[in-house]
């Protein structure tokens, strides 16, 4: 599927989610030989048996390599930065002893732009579409002339070839033919399209090229499927815009140059943090696929993937968490993300739940106990990386109460204080935050039907937010706010210590009647994962309590390919007592391996110094490792992308991975690995090196950018300890070590191009 700006408003190509086959329609290249043999380098849709086939996903591109009867094709798809076009780079090799004459057909089915409108009324709006061939641009043009309030923004689609186009079709039904589908289009079988433009119906782009690949030789061409804007429904303006936008795109060397731009972008993004560790699978995940996944999630929030249809917009808490992982690689991007999120906060301190910056619809108001609590950790992460405390005084308007526009102006710091006030004004009978609609666990709101339920998870979040803000206040001399934060934190910690500890683990909360949730006597869901990890993230409780909670997790929730969200799952649907109705046992929030929540357990174990357990939890969820353990046919998700959850025990689909790419797992797995397992992270007082390693690792290396300095960090572990730094130096000069951590002051890096750091771990 391809879209411009919004997959809801400006969807360019069709994708039929949930239908079989699940990956259709796609971007198809048909290769036809003179004898009528037809095949595709992507295998689908033709499904002709190939002599050789491979697919390789790389950062920013996908490469298919296939061979049939002496013709080898390398097909690369990518979108260059700064270009609103999907490039199809086609390279052909001929290993036969004679020249090969081939017909190539590039095909994509177009959408009607507005996906929801297409579902509701596409049988009318199909009369408002037009396709035609623009010979000057050597491109097929697709124009939607359905008038809308944002008509001027609607793009014009073009589909061009770098080679002469011998025939074309802009009409799907004409290209495919009656009673057929994409595996055998009548135009491909006939060896020619009908040069059919579209005045009404179902649009597509189909371009036909005739090529001759010499014996032992090569041939190369490319296609671009892209958009131009500002055409205002005019055919003349559309043609002018397409000709101008594509002037350089047809040149033979253009794909190479644009691919270099793409590679440079990813190289710069990766260079912010790279590691060398003894585990090659973990190293590849940390160095390559974690940052790729975090970019995807930060760009698209939870709105769109092969299952999500694009209607969810931008989740507030989702994007706030995604931006924490972006902050140390691209702080400017994270700052812009935070500014937008603050514009979606109400003056009372709470926030919207979902917003739609590109979809021309109002934000979705839904009072939850956690959304606003993700702001403080994001701000803290940005300040730790940039030390730009001037951000605190920037003014950003609140959102109007009816979500229709801007409210009163406030500084970033005032936004943070408003978030604290909202939680302080919404505490329950035990002094814990009221659950409201829900907290991070959406279904926990079912324990709160009358509005009197309380959440321990949000209580721990509140403590962490207060600690982060207190640190910032201390650094910036805001003494009155510091005193207030400390008072709020002390009260919340006291409430948690008095009412959240169940004897062997931390409770999940309280229902409307004041009954504990996540207690040893609960009906289902006796033990929840999140309170155990977040007690440690927030620094609440004694060491004995923290260890006990995580030991309970290891004993009851670890199933070898992840930690279940709770145990035992709720099992019935016929009474209010079975609160998590809807999800079957082992699914979603009812006992699945919720990978996002696993990340906090990894951080918790690393904080406690349990390196063996922390790395076990990390490595057992790496997609490649899950596939090796369970099998690809069971897991059914990509080997290069984190998933949201994996179906747990008690369900016949146990091991099935769900919701890949657009998940909070990506950001937090990246944070867990780089900042807590490898232990190199920015804090307000400098760069910390605080690794937590497996005992068999004797040395690792981390290369990181900090305050404009390229830092090379050698971490030695000659005694095979899990945690604890005993010696450190920067540029050959000793640095003090405190409580097993090496803290390198910001002054060491400012104005320095490169700095080498050495850290030695040992027994404290």
Identify the role of each PLM range.
Residues 1-67, 143-189, 258-278, 668, ...:
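An extended acidic
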Residues 100, 211-229, 462-465, 755-757:
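Short Pro-Gly-centered flexible turn/kink motifs
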Residues 257-309, 336, 340, 422, ...:
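Low-complexity, Ser/Thr/Pro/Gly-enriched N-terminal "stalk/linker" regions
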Residues 314, 318-319, 323-431, 455-463, ...:
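Aromatic-rich carbohydrate-recognition surfaces in CAZymes
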């Amino acid at each position: 599927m391809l879209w411009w700006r919004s997959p809801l408003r400006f969807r360019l190509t069709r994708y039929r989610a949930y239908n079989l086959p699940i990956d259709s329609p796609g971007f198809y290249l048909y290769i036809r030989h003179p004898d009528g043999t037809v095949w595709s380098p992507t295998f689908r849709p033709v499904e002709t048996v190939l002599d050789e086939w491979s697919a390789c996903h790389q950062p920013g591109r996908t490469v298919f390599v296939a061979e049939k009867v002496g013709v080898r094709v390398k097909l690369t798809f990518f979108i260059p930065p700064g270009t609103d076009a999907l490039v199809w780079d086609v390279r052909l090799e001929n290993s036969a002893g004679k020249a090969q004459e081939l017909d190539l057909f590039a095909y994509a089915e177009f959408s009607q732009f507005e996906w929801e409108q297409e579902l509701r009324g596409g049988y009318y709006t199909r009369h408002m579409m037009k396709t035609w061939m623009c010979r000057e641009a050597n491109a097929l043009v697709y124009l939607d002339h359905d008038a809308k309030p944002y008509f001027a923004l609607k793009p014009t689609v073009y589909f061009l070839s770098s080679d002469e186009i011998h025939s074309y079709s802009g009409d799907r039904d004409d290209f495919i033919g009656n009673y057929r589908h994409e595996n055998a289009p009548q135009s491909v079988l006939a060896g020619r399209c009908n040069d059919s433009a579209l005045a009404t119906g179902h649009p597509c782009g189909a371009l036909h090229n005739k090529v001759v690949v010499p014996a032992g030789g090569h041939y190369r061409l490319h296609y671009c499927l892209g958009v131009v804007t500002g055409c205002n429904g005019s055919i003349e303006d559309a043609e002018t815009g397409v000709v101008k936008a594509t002037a350089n795109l047809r040149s033979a060397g253009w794909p190479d140059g644009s691919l270099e731009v793409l590679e440079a972008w990813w190289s710069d993004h990766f260079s912010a943090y790279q590691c060398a560790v003894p585990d090659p699978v973990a190293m590849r995940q940390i160095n390559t696929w974690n940052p790729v996944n975090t970019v995807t999630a930060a760009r698209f929030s939870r709105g769109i993937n092969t299952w999500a249809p694009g209607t969810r917009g931008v989740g507030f808490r989702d994007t706030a968490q995604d931006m924490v992982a972006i902050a140390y690689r691209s702080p400017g991007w994270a700052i812009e993300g935070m500014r937008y999120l603050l514009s979606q906060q109400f003056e009372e301190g709470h926030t919207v739940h979902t917003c739609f910056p590109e979809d021309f619809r109002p934000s979705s108001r839904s009072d939850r106990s956690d959304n606003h609590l993700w702001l403080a950790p994001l701000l803290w992460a940005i300040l730790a990386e940039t030390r730009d405390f001037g951000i605190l005084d920037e003014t950003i308007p609140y959102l109007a109460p009816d979500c229709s526009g801007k409210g009163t102006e406030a500084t970033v710091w005032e936004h943070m204080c408003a978030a604290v006030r909202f939680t302080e004004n919404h505490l329950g009978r035990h002094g814990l935050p009221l659950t409201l609609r829900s907290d991070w666990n959406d279904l926990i709101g079912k324990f709160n039907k009358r509005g009197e339920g309380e959440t321990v998870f949000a209580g721990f979040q509140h403590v962490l937010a207060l600690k982060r803000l207190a640190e910032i206040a201390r650094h910036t001399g805001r003494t009155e706010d510091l005193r207030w934060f400390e008072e709020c934190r002390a009260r919340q910690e006291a409430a948690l210590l008095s009412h959240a500890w169940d004897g062997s683990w931390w409770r999940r909360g309280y229902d409307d009647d004041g009954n504990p949730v996540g207690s040893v006597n609960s009906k289902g869901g006796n033990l929840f994962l999140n309170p155990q990890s977040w007690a440690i993230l927030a620094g609440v409780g004694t060491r004995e309590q923290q260890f006990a909670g995580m030991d309970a997790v290891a004993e009851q929730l670890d199933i070898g390919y992840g930690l279940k969200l709770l145990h035992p799952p709720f099992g019935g649907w016929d009474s209010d007592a079975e609160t998590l109705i809807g999800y079957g046992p082992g699914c979603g929030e009812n006992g699945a391996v919720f990978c996002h929540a696993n990340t906090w357990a990894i951080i918790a174990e690393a904080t406690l110094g349990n390196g063996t357990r922390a790395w076990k939890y990390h490595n057992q969820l790496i997609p490649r490792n899950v596939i090796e353990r369970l099998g690809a046919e069971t897991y059914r998700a990509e080997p290069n992308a984190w998933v949201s959850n994996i179906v747990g025990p008690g369900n016949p689909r146990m091991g099935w991975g769900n919701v890949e790419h657009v998940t909070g797992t990506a950001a937090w797995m990246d944070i867990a690995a780089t900042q807590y397992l490898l232990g190199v992270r920015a804090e307000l007082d400098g760069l910390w090196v605080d690794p937590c390693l497996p005992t068999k690792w004797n040395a690792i290396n981390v290369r990181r950018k900090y305050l404009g300095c390229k830092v090379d960090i050698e971490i030695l572990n000659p005694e095979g300890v899990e945690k604890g730094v005993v010696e450190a130096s920067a540029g050959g000069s000793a640095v003090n070590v405190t409580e097993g951590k090496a803290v390198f002051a910001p002054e060491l890096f400012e104005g320095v191009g490169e700095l080498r750091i050495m850290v030695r771990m040992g027994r404290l």
